[in-house]
Amino acid sequence: MISAIEPKNLLRPHSQPVVTTSTLQPDDECNIELRIEDTTVDKYPAKQHARRVAAEIHRDRGLVYLMGQKSTLYEDSDQERTFRQRRYFFYMSGVDEPDCDLTYDINADKLTLYVPDFDLKRTIWMGPTLGREEALQRFDIDEVKYQSSLDEDVKQWAQNQGRGSTLYLLHESQKPAEKVPNVFIDSKTLKHAMDTSRAIKDEHEIGLIRRANEVSAAAHIDVLRGIRKMSNERDIEASFLNTSVSLGAHKQAYHIIAASGSNAATLHYSKNNEPLKGRQFVCLDAGAEWNCYASDVTRTFPMTSQWPSAEAKHIYKLVEHMQESCIVRVKEGVRYLDLHILAHRSLIRGFLTLGIFKGGTLEEIQNSGASNLFFPHGLGHHIGLEVHDVSPESIMAQDNGDYSDNVLISPNNLSPCTTSSPTLKSGMVVTIEPGIYFSQIALDNAKPEQLKYVDLELVKTYMPVGGVRIEDDILVTKTGYENLTTAPKGDGMLEIIRQGDGSCNI
């Protein structure tokens, strides 16, 4: 680990279990130690975030108006939809409660939260909603008021500001219910300002992502411990969910992908219902969410502590090398595009060694786009309040264009990247998730220039491998990186399977 940064105020809610994993020794048990820390909760830095957003707006006056997520019912039903807070609203409030809104007066530096008015019937049935005093204690807010005063407050603000004042909205559809006279509605500036702010995580946010990764690591370890007893993909999903919830993470950052065998060649496989018998690998892409912040962790493993075939071992070790080669190069100023290209070049070299690619040089194969048949997605993405988090510009531009001299790829390559890709900055958290997939659909629909260098007969022997992906969440620092993901992989992963708590049912 290079230049590790320990957040000063790592957030851990009151009386929640903390996960620590012991270092594996050859004959030791892998233990998860659960302890309860009774510490004071630091408030989510909503006011700091509001000021950062205002600085990106580049105006000294105006009112930011953000709507939280409302309680809604499923269509033709009296059952409420599962609540998921709007992430832009959370970023400037820290409030994970329904039916709230906020305003931020840039000139007055005043952040106001609006909470639901008291509803006796709802309180009897569902319990009390967020109140004013509770909200002031829990959140980094200047003032808390009831929803019933919101529209009138906005009108009063506009009147006090005079003609030409600006109301900043995230979307045109989210303007106040009542028309506000003499106000300019700006629904374009705010999103870019918030995307720019959200791309760089502060210490508090890093602490939340770290905590989400701690829970995910424990859940991945429990799957490895029990995999020899499991007989279906759904057992894997159930185990991961059980551990996550028991450690206080009631929500997943995304739908769990528990793909065995050829299912792992489907990048976002979601059925999770097929038997494990006869499958070489499971690709488990699963990450818990903590206080609205995501983790995104992928591990690929066999059903026993042995590599199921020589082909499976070759592909796993190659993906492992692809990932490690990219991670060690992460630091501020590095262009993420170059890491993506490096991963493709590592794949090509590996396939040339294995004989899967033949009849061409590294550059010829690279320019043909043949590696895209086996590695069809980008190297990764930002992560934060969204598992695919926002930024002011795409981490890898998705269109063709010119390439500068220092790029490891030629202009006619078919990879979907251009030099408009930005450089990494300290405080960004990105995933590094190379993969190799043996997809019959991809091969059947390949272009002739891509297949020119592929030994299709040899590929047949690799098809049972399905797919291998390894993914970690990486914090960018000025001089290097910190890997926030602690879930075991490689030999440590196999050792946990060996020490698992059941005989093999596969």
UniProtKB/Swiss-Prot annotation:
Q: Does the keyword Manganese apply?
A: yes
**For this protein, what reaction is catalysed?**
Release of any N-terminal amino acid, including proline, that is linked to proline, even from a dipeptide or tripeptide
Q: What is the main EC category here?
A: hydrolase
- Keyword Manganese listed? The answer is yes
Q: Which CDD domains match?
A: Prolidase
The cofactor note from the UniProt entry for this protein is:
Binds 2 manganese ions per subunit.
Keyword annotations? Aminopeptidase, Hydrolase, Manganese, Metal-binding, Metalloprotease, Protease
Q: Which cofactor does it need?
A: Mn(2+)
**Ligand binding (Mn(2+) 2):** 285, 296, 471
Q: Which SMART domains match?
A: AMP_N
> Where is Mn(2+) 1 bound in this sequence?
296, 433, 471
Give EC number(s), comma-separated: 3.4.11.9
What InterPro entries does the record tag this protein with? Answer: Aminopep_P_N, Creatin/AminoP/Spt16_N, Creatinase/aminopeptidase-like, Pept_M24, Peptidase_M24B_aminopep-P_CS, X-Pro_dipept-like
| UniProt-recorded Gene Ontology molecular function terms | manganese ion binding; metalloaminopeptidase activity
GO terms, biological process: proteolysis
General function of this protein:
Catalyzes the removal of a penultimate prolyl residue from the N-termini of peptides.
Stored PANTHER family: XAA-PRO AMINOPEPTIDASE 3, XAA-PRO AMINOPEPTIDASE AN0832-RELATED
Q: Which family is this protein grouped under? A: Belongs to the peptidase M24B family.
**What is the name of the protein in this document?**
Probable Xaa-Pro aminopeptidase BDCG_04966
Q: Which organism is it from?
A: Ajellomyces dermatitidis (strain ER-3 / ATCC MYA-2586)
